[in-house]
């Protein structure tokens, strides 16, 4: 007797023809086939198969099988970003479980009279599908709403369910916990919250390495984890660590013939090649991957492909082609409402405007990007500093294009670039670990500091140039930075987010200096620097702006250092 019998059309799915059989064994076999189709990312075929079982399951009077249909459909809608469908499936699972829980509590005698399941079977079903519902609830909070706190709470409920009453559900529970962690970690990375994802990735990798690895479920998790963690490594500047995971995930996906999963690993490898400066290999990989990604209806990944297509066009100065490709990326990100990514692609598209000499259009895009960033509740000071530095680059380009009226533009550019440079550099020198300092220099501070020097030099402001040199000399670190820097436009939308970051280090930067023995680099903020006994400390206004805008106190509360002979 079905206790839930609503049709699935409300979830946005068309009715499907019913199968001509209703054997529970055959239905269970079809559910397993649907699961394999989901693993292969053939969601349309899986959905049609699942929908075709609805009437037959109703005739078989098996609510447990119907719950499995809802659970699998919910997963399909989740990965396809059809979040209304996820909510519909989640609601149906919850409604059904509520009825059976009331039966077991003895508070619903009418429903109890209709139920044909034993108490043990009811308890088994409640345990199994409460977990599956919690998985959908957690994934929905992370992926659809970016509500990482709710996702974390949901994950705690899922991991805290340590019941051993049904040993046959233990493997499935491990699967949904690990899969939920992958989804939550990936969602954090989408929002530039890579630091918060680290504990999740640690749990995921441990689960992968300790699994038996002898089932399709294990292989699916390995592919999802390897792809997600590989992307995490690329985005945090750990390219050497990314490649083995992406290769391993790609090989396992290829073994099963999972075309979309294979393509996604290829695409992540292409992003690593771009970061390493290997444009030819990046182009080969992204073009090979795009077809399967587009056919898989992954709007976010499609947008990322178009971003790299645009970057490749921009690298050979095909401005119209680059702008068109960036436009495709922006359109797809707007469709899935990704404000942080829309802000990035607007900044990237503004480089096309800069190269065309259309500085008004570049500023307009940048101002729209700022509005999106300001409305983003999880924005970081580093994102704001990078945006200010970018606007300074527009003003610098405008000044270079109009030498007769350049002074005012250079001054405005310096007002943006120098405080941003001081802020990110102060964070670099708050790090006691030398490798962390070098990663921060490679991916954040070196380029921004170089831009500040360039503006001061091109402005002809010898006083500011001297002060920047004095500041850098006081750090004792002229020889510790990489020699070559990529052009500004190459990293606007793809800049790495080092784990040695963000708000925590803004606070550390304001702390006391760290003694490092005989080291040439002073850790922590510098005290005020005075180059001339008749004048005040250098760059005082720029340091004040750095604190006002980003919360980075770049000056230690100590007596001033005198740098004259």
Predicted regions and their residues:
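Amphipathic alpha-helical segments of tetratricopeptide repeats
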Residues: 51-58, 91-104, 156-168, 202-214, ...
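Short coil/turn linker motifs that delimit alpha-helical repeat modules in TPR/alpha-solenoid proteins
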Residues: 22-23, 41-42, 61-62, 120, ...
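Structural register within alpha-helical repeat arrays
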Residues: 33, 66, 73, 138, ...
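Alpha-helical solenoid repeat scaffolds used for protein-protein interaction
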Residues: 294, 300, 311-565
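Residue register of alpha-helical TPR repeats
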Residues: 28, 66-70, 129-133, 172, ...
């Amino acid at each position: 007797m079905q206790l839930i019998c609503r049709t699935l059309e409300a979830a946005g799915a068309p009715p499907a023809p019913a199968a001509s059989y209703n054997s529970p064994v055959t239905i269970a076999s079809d559910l397993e086939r649907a699961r394999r189709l989901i693993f292969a990312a053939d969601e349309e075929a899986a959905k049609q198969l699942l929908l075709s079982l609805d009437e037959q399951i109703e005739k078989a009077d098996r609510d447990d099988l119907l719950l499995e249909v809802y659970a699998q459909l919910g997963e399909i809608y989740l990965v396809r970003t059809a979040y209304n469908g996820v909510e519909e499936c989640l609601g149906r699972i919850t409604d059904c479980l509520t009825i059976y829980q009331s039966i077991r509590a003895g508070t619903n005698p009418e429903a109890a009279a209709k139920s044909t399941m034993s108490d043990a079977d009811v308890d088994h079903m409640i345990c199994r599908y409460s977990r599956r519902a919690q998985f959908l609830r957690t994934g929905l909070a992370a992926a659809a709403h970016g509500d990482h706190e709710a996702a974390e709470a949901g994950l705690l409920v899922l991991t805290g369910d340590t019941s051993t009453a049904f040993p046959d559900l233990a493997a499935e529970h491990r699967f949904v916990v690990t899969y939920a962690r992958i989804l939550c970690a990936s969602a954090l990375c989408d929002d530039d919250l890579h630091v918060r994802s680290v504990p999740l990735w640690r749990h995921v990798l441990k689960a992968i390495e300790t699994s038996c690895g002898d089932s399709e479920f294990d292989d699916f998790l390995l592919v999802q984890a390897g792809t997600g963690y590989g992307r995490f490594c690329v985005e945090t500047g750990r390219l050497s660590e990314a490649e083995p995971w992406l290769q391993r995930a790609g090989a396992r996906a290829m073994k099963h013939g999972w075309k979309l999963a294979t393509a996604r690993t290829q695409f992540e490898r292409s992003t690593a090649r771009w970061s390493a400066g290997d444009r030819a290999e990046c182009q080969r990989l992204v073009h090979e991957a795009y077809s399967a990604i587009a056919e898989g209806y992954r709007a976010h990944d499609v947008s990322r492909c178009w971003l790299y297509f645009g970057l490749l066009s921009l690298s050979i100065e095909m401005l119209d082609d680059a702008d068109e490709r960036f436009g495709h990326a922006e359109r797809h990100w707007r469709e899935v409402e990704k404000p942080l990514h829309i802000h990035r692609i607007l900044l990237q598209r503004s480089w096309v405007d800069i190269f065309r000499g259309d500085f008004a259009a570049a500023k307009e895009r940048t101002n729209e990007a700022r509005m999106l960033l300001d409305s983003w509740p999880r924005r970081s000071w580093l994102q704001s500093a990078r945006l200010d530095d970018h606007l300074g680059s527009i003003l610098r380009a405008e000044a270079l294009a109009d030498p007769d009226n350049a002074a005012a533009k250079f001054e405005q550019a310096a007002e943006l670039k120098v405080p941003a440079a001081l802020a990110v550099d102060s964070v670099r020198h708050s790090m006691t670990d030398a490798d962390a300092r070098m990663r921060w220099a490679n991916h954040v501070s070196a380029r921004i500091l170089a831009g500040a020097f360039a503006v001061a030099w091109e402005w002809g402001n010898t006083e500011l140039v001297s002060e920047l040199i004095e500041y850098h000399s006081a750090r004792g670190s002229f020889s510790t930075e990489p020699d070559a820097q990529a052009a500004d436009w190459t990293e606007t939308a793809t800049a790495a987010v080092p784990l040695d970051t963000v708000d925590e280090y803004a606070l550390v930067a304001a702390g006391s200096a760290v003694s490092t023995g005989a080291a040439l680099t002073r850790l922590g903020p510098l005290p005020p620097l005075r180059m001339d006994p008749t004048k005040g400390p250098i760059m005082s206004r720029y340091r004040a702006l750095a604190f006002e805008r980003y919360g980075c106190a770049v000056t230690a509360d100590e007596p001033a250092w005198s740098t004259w002979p």
